[in-house]
Swiss-Prot record:
Catalytic activities: adenosine(37) in tRNA + dimethylallyl diphosphate = N(6)-dimethylallyladenosine(37) in tRNA + diphosphate
Purpose of the protein: Catalyzes the transfer of a dimethylallyl group onto the adenine at position 37 in tRNAs that read codons beginning with uridine, leading to the formation of N6-(dimethylallyl)adenosine (i(6)A).
Domain of life: Bacteria
Organism field: Desulfatibacillum aliphaticivorans
Gene name of this polypeptide: miaA
A GO term, aspect molecular function: ATP binding
Lineage of source species: Bacteria, Pseudomonadati, Thermodesulfobacteriota, Desulfobacteria, Desulfobacterales
Protein name: tRNA dimethylallyltransferase
EC number: 2.5.1.75
Protein keywords: ATP-binding, Magnesium, Nucleotide-binding, Transferase, tRNA processing
Amino acid sequence: MPSKEKIVVIAGPTGVGKSASTLPLAREFGGEIISADAVSVYRCLDIGAAKPGMEDRRLVPHHMIDVVDPDEDFDANIYAAQARAIAQSLHESDKRVFVDGGTGFYIKALLYGLFTEGRSDPELRDSLRREAAQLGSHALHDRLKDLDPPSAKRIHPNDAYRITRALEICILTGKPASAQQAAHGFEESPYDVLFFCLHREREILYQRTDQRVDQMLAMGLEQEVRGLLENGYGPELKSMQSIGYRHMCQYITGALNYEDAVTLMKRDTRRLAKRQMTWFKAYPEIRWMAPDETEAMRREISLFLE
């Protein structure tokens, strides 16, 4: 039986310091980085996604960043297909593959695949989107509460994209999307994986996420969002529902004052970090590391890649 191709994953919650660990390790071992971040795939969403700078990308090639425009459809299925193709190309070129990110569902999709019952119907999807435009996403969210309460609890009432997708799966399959995901055991991974997850004390992590928000605002997040809106990328788009972009849209459109928008942005960033930690704790194969344990990670990677 042929040996599996090897992948090193360095995951963790937002603000923990993943890139500062992954970049030097990938460079040292002759690797390239596949990003696993649900916001970084969108072009023009730069500050709020905290994308690596061009100098970092010059030092180590990064993939799955700036893949689609803000108004294009993108999900974990698309991510998995594209990321797996990149991983195969890198392996064929004798490059080491490093995966860096905090979007656990994308990482799981890359490593293990996704459930296949979530079929799609473009006509049904367009109909649901028109309904959302006419009645508002909250009306569809109420409908989702009846058909799939767990998904409704997980999805924000303003997130029209995810609401319509969950409804589409419910209608097409007759089963809640949440039940299908829970029942799916995922396929055996085609990769041999060394999986690290970085962690910090909760209070320190939350201090860092608050500082991260302040830094994004100082870098011009509001101006970036205004530019996106002026270019026709509306608040209803999936990309614009991301943390930071959603809050600045609400401020710019008058739904929130600036102080409240910033307060909610910090709160929601902390909540995201907490959810991400909960997600990664479900992986029994993870090696938990503090961000400053670079030498320990280096030793394990060296042994793994031999």
